[in-house]
Amino acid sequence: MFRVRSTLVALGAASLVLIGACAAPAPFETRSGPPGSAPAGELAEFYDQQVAFEPCAPYATTALDEKLFADDRYDCARVQVPLDYADPDGPRGEVALLRVKARGEKIGSLLVNPGGPGGSGMNFVALLGPLWAAGPVGERFDVIGFDPRGVGASTPRVDCYTDAEYERGEGFSGALVPDVADEQEARMVAQRCAEGSGGPQALASFGSSNVVRDMDVLRATLGDEKLSYLGISYGTQLGAVYAEAFPQNVRAMALDSAIDPDLTATEFNLAQMTGFQKAFERYAADCATSADCPLGTDPVRATEAFQAIARPLLEHPAPTADGRGLTYDDVMNAMTSALYAQSLWPKLTEGLAELAAGRGDVLQAQRDSAFGRGPDGRYNNSGDAAYAIRCMDLPRRTPAEQTELARQIRAAAPFMDSGRPVRESHHECEAWPQPPTLPQPWVTGPVGLPPTLTVSITGDPATPYEGGINLARVLGGSLLTVEGAQHGIALLGQSECVDGLVADYLIDLQTPPDGARCTA
């Protein structure tokens, strides 16, 4: 079975001949008209549709969803959107959403995206629903988690690989620079994704440019004149792109762990890998304070020690209790996902010690969590969706540029170096049915935007702190600096300081004072 081989595995679940012919999705345009106004004409039926909420159980797509969505405190709905906004009379999709009703006097809806791309907002809000329902945000807002087009319970849904193929290591590996050997492999990837996801027109519709248009439809159908929004990680990019397209429709926008708007996609890749290397070094230094650290007591030699543990898996996976085995790619996904938060370091140390002793069960569990694998062996579709969304968002590199990026990443993050030669590879989206539709740069400074709030963590490995500074500047909004070493913090119940300031902003539109700082 075909497999996209990874030159460099970096992110867990987390990225020629065209397949058929379809019209390119229209680039989004800034809308005119009064705040909250629905467009006249062909799109009016989407903006004017009535949302029918119902029990959430039928919306579950994973074992975890089945458990969470059985809670009768939540209700769910689907909202119709055009696959192609330039052809509203053509095929349609449905965006699924989950609601936690406000328990007090309601301001409106708070739309939430947890990142990814490919993350399920429904699952995220269901997980945090009890926490938010008990706090000030849950008192004043209907909290709405939505699955962006292509994700989770929304339809059509990105589907490139089966659960069985992921179990055999034949699906997307989580590689930042997938090693696609030639044009034929690129065509095979695009063809199987199109076949499983509703065809080439659907596959070309999954970009962020369409998602922000869907968000405006959601705003209107939920009855909100203006949008209140919480976006984390990739969700900050969605928020900023929405603000650029619909500045007059923004009420409040809290953006946590920001994608840097000043960097090209390649520059961001390198900044991110530099951030992971710094996180690895912080972890190694912490681990080295213990005499039984599996990477040794000299942090300077931690990269060498890690490679000595991980590289043998390139040839011989470590045994695991379920018989799947732990591969090199699995270890890298477990490692990088555990570097997202310092709270995961003890489990990472346990897993590396176990691996050094010849077993891979602990790290396999971390890998499964990162890849969205449930205890029943079913995977969510976050990996497939991330791949498809990036293909419609990011510029496509030439083989020479792709190969050079792989070399640069090895230099930026040596702990990820497999030791194998970097070979020339083609861009994984080379044969996608349409070119990317997200403008570059994707935000330049919306006109008429109300105050926004960007939260940025000083030791964030995945979205470096400087990105938050830059996004706050471009949006003309406020910055909240958080001293810590993790990715994502707003309204997660981990910092009273952060949660209080974010809640004050969302509820009362009160931004923190200049230079405001909190501790994770």
Give the label of every model feature segment.
Residues 33-330, 388-390, 394-520:
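Gly/Pro-rich cap/lid or specificity-loop segments adjacent to the active site
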Residues 316-333, 340-344, 376-384:
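Structural motif
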Residues 361-394, 398-402:
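Long, low-complexity segments enriched in small/aliphatic residues
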Residues 259-277, 351-353, 360-375:
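Flexible "cap/lid" loop of the alpha/beta hydrolase fold
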Residues 1-27, 79, 215:
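Secretory targeting and sorting signals
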Residues 337-338, 392:
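Helix-loop "lid/cap" segments that line or gate small-molecule binding pockets
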Residues 339-358, 396-401:
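Short helix-capping/linker segments at secondary-structure and domain boundaries
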Residues 290, 355-363, 495:
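Short, solvent-exposed helix-helix connector turns and helix-capping sites enriched
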